[in-house]
Amino acid sequence: MKSPKYRPGTTNRITVTSVREDACTYNTDTPEALHRFWCDVIAAQPEHEPDKETVVVVMMNARLRPYAWHRVSLGSVSECSAQPREIFRPVIAAGAYGFALTHNHPSGDPSPSRADEAITRRINEA
């Protein structure tokens, strides 16, 4: 039985999307800066669905500048779920120094939901 061909940047389960080289100029040390990165890079992708909650992990280099991202989960209008293993797997596969977990709220209300707080606790515990 033949093994599948190796394709850099992908596995059978994970696809990590590299960002433009100039995206590494983004300073992502504040929530506002991460929001700008989301709007300029992630939301600009043709496959982005702004009417659904989307969880994205952004991989960062040693200067905490983004160089890749992975859509962890696509949900509904009001919710999206993600497990720590789904979040950490692409981070480890990409060899990231650091990461930021981001998601949108289609409602436009940035207040964290109970589900947001619960996943934050689970990730901190992991």
Segments from the language model and where they lie:
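Glycine-enriched loop-and-adjacent helix/strand subsegments that border the catalytic/binding cleft
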Residues: D22-R65
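Active-site-proximal loop/helix of nucleotide/amide-processing enzymes and allied scaffolds
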Residues: M1-A23, M59-R63, S73-A126
